[in-house]
Curated annotation (Swiss-Prot):
It is an enzyme of class 2 (transferase). Binds 2 coenzyme F430 non-covalently per MCR complex. Coenzyme F430 is a yellow nickel porphinoid. Methyl-coenzyme-M reductase is activated when the enzyme-bound coenzyme F430 is reduced to the Ni(I) oxidation state. The gene is mcrG. The lineage of its organism: Archaea, Methanobacteriati, Methanobacteriota, Methanomada group, Methanococci. It comes from Methanocaldococcus jannaschii (strain ATCC 43067 / DSM 2661 / JAL-1 / JCM 10045 / NBRC 100440) (Methanococcus jannaschii). This is Methyl-coenzyme M reductase I subunit gamma. InterPro entries: Me_CoM_Rdtase_Fd-like_fold (IPR009024), Me_CoM_Rdtase_gsu (IPR003178), Me_CoM_Rdtase_gsu_sf (IPR036994).
Length: 260
């Protein structure tokens, strides 16, 4: 019988949102359409229209030894062309952001190939071939309900702010002030790229989502939202893992695991 992945335990809306993020068969709601060139500007690795820099010749031009694994795995387009590795990094506010670091790590690994990612307390980096990363960033990481202009920041450096209070417009604090709230349009504008270099012209990433919408799609348990302690199934799994790691790792005897 084929294995059907469960993705994540829990019976609450938060648990279901996490499962939806991780499940490659679930198509997240598209909320905006940021032009490709604007995504390139925010990432800051190349100029719009500039050729991709390469680190090796196209694979079809390379004289490589036989490798069964390489024959089995279809390379990404960026790998085929020899494009270099680049990154994009996001900071997620604790105030009902749609995504958060561990959710991002699990989602990236379930949905995408050829990625490397690193989890920190308030930010998550993803690295892959540059051309593939640009497409992934636009089509999933920014255009969909995985992103909110106010509660998620694209920050390659000086990422602090995820746990700080929001400003009067609901924007997460950013020490480099990469984005501003346009009171005329109600949209968020990026005036700097992800590492804080000023842009020639602002990039419009759309209108912040209403608080009700954020609470509906967030993957964060909060006492003023959906408390984690309300999800009995999740608590059972977390306690089991904690007990197995603590007691099993320290003294891996049969009676420890019988009590799990």
């Amino acid at each position: 019988m084929a294995y059907k992945p469960q993705f994540y335990p829990g019976q609450t809306k938060i648990a279901q949102n996490r499962r939806d993020h991780m499940n490659p068969d679930v198509q997240l709601e598209k909320l905006r359409d940021i032009p490709d060139d604007d995504v390139v500007k925010i990432m800051g690795h190349r100029q719009p229209g500039e050729d991709y820099k390469t680190v090796h010749p196209p694979l079809e031009e390379m004289d490589l030894p036989e490798d069964y694994v390489r024959d089995l795995v279809e390379p990404l387009n960026g790998a085929k062309e020899g494009h270099r590795i680049r990154y994009i990094q996001f900071t997620d506010s604790m105030y009902f952001a749609p995504a958060q670091p561990y959710d991002r790590a699990r989602t990236y690994m379930w949905r995408f190939r050829g990625v490397d990612t690193g989890t920190l307390s308030g930010r998550q980096v993803i690295e892959m071939r540059e051309s593939d990363l640009e497409a992934l960033s636009k089509n999933f990481l920014i255009d969909t309900a995985f992103f909110d202009p106010a509660r998620i920041g694209i920050r390659g450096a000086t990422v602090h702010g995820h746990s700080l209070r929001l400003d009067e417009n609901g924007l997460m604090f950013d020490a480099l002030q990469r984005y501003v709230y346009d009171e005329k349009t109600g949209h968020v504008l990026y005036v700097k790229d992800q590492v804080g270099r000023p842009l020639d012209e602002p990039v419009d990433v759309g209108e912040p989502l209403p608080e009700e919408k954020l609470k509906e799609i967030t993957t964060i348990y909060r006492i003023d939202g959906v408390p984690m302690r309300e999800d009995e199934e999740l608590l059972t799994v977390v306690k089991r893992i904690h007990r197995a790691r603590t007691l099993g790792g320290f003294l891996p005897v049969e009676d420890v695991f019988e009590k799990l």
